[in-house]
Every structure is written in C-alpha cells, then in structure tokens.
C-alpha cells in the first residue's frame, strides 16, 4: 500500500502479519500438538486422542521421536506466533523531495534494535537498482544505492514481483527521486 503526492511518497510495508503466516503457525501448532499428544499417550498407555489407539505405538523409539517432533514443532510455532504478534518487518519507506530526505523504518525483534530507522539525503542516492536472479527460485529485488554505504533493499524477500511489476516500480521510484536505474 502506498500514498503519493507531488513531493512525498510513503510506501507502507505489511511485515509478518500475513494470512500465510497465520495459516502456517496454526497448522504447525495443531500438528505438533498432535505429535506431542500421541507421544504422551504412548508413554501413559491410554488414549488421549480417541481416534488413534495408543497401543499401536510403543514408547521406545516411536513415542520418544513423536514427542520430540511435537516439542520442536511447538517451539517453531511459538516463534511464528511471536513474529506475528511483534509484526516483525513492518514499517514504511518515506521519500520526501521537498525536505530532500529518505526515511526507512522497520520493526525488528524486541531488544536494543527493535526500531530500525535509517535516514538519508536524496542527493546521496546514486541509483535505484534491480537485481534479477533467474532459475528455479527466481528472485527480483529492488535496491537503493547510497554513496558510501551498501545497497538497501526496498522490496521484501517473499514479494514475488513479475519483471514488469518490478520494472514499473523501479521506474516510478527513479523518476520520483530523479536518479538513474541500474539492472544487475
């Protein structure tokens, strides 16, 4: 989602609160809970899950392995739920021609660097760069090259833009910032 006027362009980024992340966290939680319950029911020797008889699974080694997978899945699921609740990766890109500044803000993980805020002068921007990697896992990323610093990615890694969409976005941004486009 973006908002644009003659002198200001604001690009809002959704972060980790996406439907796919909610679905994966929920599916992983239910699956790992099922594995853990089967492992516990094989240890206790009674059915905690009614549609799956625990007598068919002996505790050593199947019950232990299923319990381990269940615990590992719960840890991964809790990690996903934490990134969703903290909304890691969300933020905005602000391009202000009137003031001559670019501000990039992202939310990170809790701690000292939770808020990631970068500010640059527009005159320090060398170019808008498109990096294309073709193959099985095709990847197209839009970068902003800044003098004296490394390139800053402007698109998310999971954002699968078509070549036409990434070119259009790069052309609009380069026109707005009045900088050239580079393709790698």
From Swiss-Prot:
One of its GO terms (cellular component) is photosystem I. One of its GO terms (biological process) is photosynthesis. Seems to be required for the assembly of the photosystem I complex. Its main location: plastid. Keywords: Chloroplast, Membrane, Photosynthesis, Plastid, Thylakoid, Transmembrane, Transmembrane helix. HAMAP family: Ycf4. It comes from Ipomoea purpurea. Belongs to the Ycf4 family. It holds the Pfam family Ycf4. The keyword Transmembrane applies. It is a multi-pass membrane protein. The gene is ycf4. The chain crosses the membrane at residues 22-42, 57-77. It is found in: Plastid, Chloroplast thylakoid membrane. InterPro entries: PSI_Ycf4_assembly. This is Photosystem I assembly protein Ycf4.
